[in-house]
Amino acid sequence: MALAARRKVRIRLYGTNPADVDQVAREIVDLAKKMGVQVRGPIPLPTRRLVVTVRRAPSGQGYHTYDHWEMRISKRLIDIEASERVLRRLMTIRVPDTVKIELQLI
């Protein structure tokens, strides 16, 4: 295969369920290794923690009690030196609704 046909692809995975993110990352790495391309990752990126504090009492009277709601966003990064054939195979991977994928050609 010609060198011009190979490109580096940066894949960013993120989602609220870390098990789903890890499972999709494992599938991508296994597919890339099976096809014989160079893979770097999955690299765990810092988990983003979103916290929302709300007052329990709707009227403002009474005790000052608060609820804390939290959502954690897990992220993984994978670099692949891939050809068009590998990218087509990557598109066939089933991805849960809780996982989002960004592809970037570098």
Curated annotation (Swiss-Prot):
Indicate yes or no for the key word Ribosomal protein.
yes
PROSITE patterns the record matches: RIBOSOMAL_S10
Biological process (GO) annotations?
translation
The UniProt keyword set, sorted, is: Ribonucleoprotein, Ribosomal protein
- Recall the GO molecular function terms of this protein's record: structural constituent of ribosome; tRNA binding
- Which first-to-last residue range defines the signal peptide? none
Do you know which InterPro entries this protein is assigned to? Answer: Ribosomal_uS10, Ribosomal_uS10_CS, Ribosomal_uS10_dom, Ribosomal_uS10_dom_sf, Ribosomal_uS10_euk/arc
Q: Which GO terms describe its cellular component?
A: small ribosomal subunit
State the PANTHER family in the record.
30S RIBOSOMAL PROTEIN S10 FAMILY MEMBER
> How does this polypeptide assemble, per the annotation?
Part of the 30S ribosomal subunit.
Similarity remark: Belongs to the universal ribosomal protein uS10 family.
Role of this protein: Involved in the binding of tRNA to the ribosomes.
Q: What protein is this chain from? A: Small ribosomal subunit protein uS10
Organism whose genome encodes this protein: Pyrobaculum arsenaticum (strain DSM 13514 / JCM 11321 / PZ6)
